[in-house]
């Protein structure tokens, strides 16, 4: 059968149907209490000295649903045997897909001696399991919301179960504010260049990966300053919508149309207008200097080419 003709929804359902637990078919996500017990039992079986849970599962402010990851850490005397032979992970259940970032050949290691197994199971459960050598346990001190699940030797005594302030949006310095604003306006000119050359992917890539991200950064600041910088909009700004009115949300998401040269150009113009407005608001509320002349110059440049329908003069095409 051609891969184009496969019904992947049915394939997934069939893969669920073959799972067995207590001789019964499993087609639902396992309960949180059951997962906690499983995490403890597997950890004890492999010799974990301490077991901790962090992330959104320990954050009382995080919305609760079955899609929340279980961010788990096993503190081990020696993690290498568990890295060399991952067969012990089978005890958690059938895995749909797995990643091991610290073993990646395309990205450099980032945990300095710890190792993670990122696992998405067939029933929908997601566990991000970090193996931390006992000698490196101090590195967990800044793990947001770390909550000991098993710690007979008080290895995780430094854990602060209620501390999620690590996630709070930080008040920017003058230098940081200036650099973020400059980056937005500077990269705007790359988008214009791509539009004039009819290089849609080039233009859209710069608009989304840089300009859009800088806009979200300043949207976060506007939210945070109203909350005395004691708030988080979540990873990848996933909670930002809850701080905006329906109108504001529609206006923001309308900027994500990069499907044509014209649409991408309109998104750039609207994005610039919104960024400029929010930057001025932040400048006033936080007492930060904003280079309005830089902003006006780039907006005028963008508007000039927009009014020419992103068409270069013939003499400039040579």
For the regions a protein language model found, what residue spans apply to each?
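Conserved NTP/Mg2+-binding pocket subregion across the NTase superfamily
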Residues: 12, 19-25, 94-202, 206-208, ...
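Metal-dependent nucleotidyltransferase catalytic core
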Residues: 19-46, 54-67, 72-130
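Short aromatic-enriched loop/helix-cap "lid" or pocket-rim segments at secondary-structure transitions
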Residues: 64-66, 141-143, 233
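Conserved nucleotidyltransferase catalytic core and NTase-mimicking acidic/glycine-rich helix/loop elements
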Residues: 168-318
């Amino acid at each position: 059968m051609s891969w184009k003709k496969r019904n992947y929804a049915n394939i997934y359902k069939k893969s669920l149907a073959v799972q067995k637990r207590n001789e019964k078919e499993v087609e639902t996500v396992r309960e949180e209490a059951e997962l906690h017990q499983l995490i403890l039992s597997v950890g004890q079986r492999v010799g974990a000295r301490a077991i901790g849970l962090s992330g959104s599962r320990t954050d009382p402010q995080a919305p609760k649903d079955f899609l929340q990851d279980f961010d788990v850490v096993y503190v081990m005397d020696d993690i290498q045997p568990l890295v060399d032979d991952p067969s012990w992970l089978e005890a958690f259940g059938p895995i749909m897909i797995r990643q091991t970032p610290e073993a990646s050949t395309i990205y450099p290691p980032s945990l300095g001696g710890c190792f993670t197994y990122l696992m998405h199971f067939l029933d929908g459960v997601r566990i991000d399991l970090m193996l931390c050598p006992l000698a490196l346990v101090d590195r967990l001190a800044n793990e947001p919301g770390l909550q000991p699940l098993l710690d007979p030797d008080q290895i995780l005594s430094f854990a602060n179960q209620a501390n999620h302030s690590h996630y709070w949006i930080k008040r920017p310095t003058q230098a940081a504010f200036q650099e973020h604003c400059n980056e937005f306006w500077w990269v705007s000119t790359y988008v214009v260049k791509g539009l004039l050359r009819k290089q849609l992917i080039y233009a859209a890539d710069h608009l989304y990966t840089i300009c859009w991200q800088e806009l979200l950064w300043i949207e976060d600041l506007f939210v945070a300053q109203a909350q005395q910088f004691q708030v988080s909009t979540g990873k990848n700004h996933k909670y930002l919508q809850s701080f905006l009115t329906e109108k504001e949300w529609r206006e923001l998401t309308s900027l994500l149309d990069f499907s044509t040269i014209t649409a991408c150009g309109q998104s750039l113009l609207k994005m610039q207008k919104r960024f400029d407005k929010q930057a001025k608001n932040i400048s006033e509320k936080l007492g930060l200097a904003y280079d309005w002349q830089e902003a006006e110059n780039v907006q005028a440049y963008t508007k000039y080419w927009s009014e020419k329908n992103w068409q270069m003069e013939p003499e400039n095409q040579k």
